[in-house]
Amino acid sequence: MKRSLLYSGLMLALLGVFAGCNKDSKSDENWKDIPSNQFTAESGKAEISVNSIPVSMGNVKLTASSATEGVLQMNNVIPCASSVAVNVNLKNTGDSKWAFSGEGNIYNMAVMSLFSTDKTPIYTVSVEGEIDGNEKISIKAATKVVAKGGMEGDWNLLREAAPDKDRVPVVTPLQITWTASGDYAVSAAMMGKMLSIFGSVQLADQLDRLSFTEDGNVTARYWESDEDSGNSGIPDMKEFDGIIKKLVGPDGKYHFVPTTHTEKEWIDLPPANLAFWYANGGNLFVLPNLSVLSEMEGAQADAFVTRAADLSGLSELLEELQKLGVDPKEILPVIKNFMANGLVMKYVVTDNSLQLFMDKELCDPIVKPLLPLLDQLDKKLEDMAKNPDITEEQKAELQKLQTLMGVFGLTKPSDLKAVWANTTEFAVAMNFVR
């Protein structure tokens, strides 16, 4: 009797174990019900944000490999990174819902999608979200710069400089270094000096700070007028001495301050995923997020950049440039380089100062293909000079330009072609401090 009871109890226990195992096995198989189809932001079934900014384009796909692991594929979701795959951990939260989270690396960023074999991560991306059986998915993604190069943080435009022995500022907010050989040495030196001063006055009025954030955003404190002043921006050489005197303060130093607005009128551009940055090999790469810029209106979106990155409009752009004398074969590499790398500048970080600059090595591939445009400018100015119907304002602007060219030792804009051909050193730089 005891043996019978013991046997019956053992059988019941075994049945309970088998039933429990069968129940767990069935529960473990629920992960196979996780939707593995592609979700698009445009459809409304994918609610996505990157750095807390909602994403309106792109598609995602979650592929589960077990009850605890899967891969989240994001296409055209992370700005400037066309395809990003992240290994995620899965957790069943009930009601046919699964939470996921994970972190991955980004090895290549580009204005447009390009194949890369680079194995050094420049960004990390972390994700968390939820997917349910009703085929809806929510994702919160956050990016973080790995390739910082000492650039991260706020950089204020240089606004104060001591004079050198010739009473010229030793450094300026916008600094142009220009050296040429032979008969063009004086012209290059004069242009470097004058344009540094005039350019610094303009820059000091329009830019106060650049910020390179940890999540990769490039932001700025800047100023722009709501009204068109009608000013062509051509420097008036008659005002040069007066400008120099106004820049010198009681302390004998040069002070570059806003001239058309107050300090309280600066505009802060918040992080909005408009442009991303990373530093590598002594170069700073700034990549515009074209998917966002193309949705912006008016002057906020740069037409050339948008059209150059739109393959359907590229041929039209090249045709227009060809009509102006630009060889499409020479300008195409410039456009392709921009598509791959965005805006590329060299940089030097020293203690609490930063210099961003483009030297002759970076400028040459851009300047040379565009030099034929100067011939068109020659003709335009010649036609203006012969036209008796131009306005008094146009006459004044033409006179300023002719005076400026005379100071630089030029008779017409196309003379710059010879100056550039004999240029031995060139750099245009912006200087910042912490």
Segments from the language model and where they lie:
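Bacterial N-terminal signal peptides that target proteins for export
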Residues: 1-9
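Acidic/polar, low-complexity intrinsically disordered N-terminal segments immediately downstream
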Residues: 4, 22-193, 197-200, 207, ...
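C-terminal motif of bacterial Sec signal peptides marking the signal peptidase cleavage site
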Residues: 16-20
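Residue-level recognition of conserved beta-strand positions in structured domain cores
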Residues: 102-104, 141, 222, 288, ...
